[in-house]
Amino acid sequence: MRALEPWVAAPLQTFISESSARLILLMTTSGQVVAQHGFSRSVEVMTAAALGAAIVASTEELARIMGSPRFAALVHGGNRQSCMLSAFGTPRGRWIGLVVFGSETSVGLVQLFFDQMVAELVTAAPREQPQTSPLPENFERELDTSLKELFGR
C-alpha cells in the first residue's frame, strides 16, 4: 500500500483487511492519485485513475441530465472480479475510490467497509489552512523559494 498523505494510511489499511479488496485507488476528481494498493505498475495506476475519474464525471453528468442526485456508487459485476467506483467529500475536496474485489466478498460488504473508511478519512483529514497571499515586498523571495522547492534546486 502507498499513500501520499500519512493520515490516509490507517483507514485504507483497515478497509483493505476488512473488505478483502484486491485493488484500491483513492484519487481526486481530476484523477490525481492519493493512495493505492495492489497495483504492480505505475502505468496501471495512472490509467485506472484517469478512467475512474472520467467514469465518475460522466455518470454525474448523466445524473444531472436525468434530474437525479449524484449516484452514490457505480458497481460493475463480473464472473471473477467486480469493480466499485464511489465519489465522496472530504475536507480536502471531493475524492473517488475505485475498488476491485473478488467473489470471496460481496458488494454489500465492500460498500459497508468503504463507507466506514470514508468516515474515518473525513475525521482524520487535517483541515487546510487558508493560504495567505504574498505581500508585494516578499513576492520575489517567495517566488524564488517556491521555484527552488518545485525544481529541487
Task: Describe each region flagged by the PLM.
Residues M1-A21, S30, V34-R153:
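Acidic, low-complexity cytosolic segments
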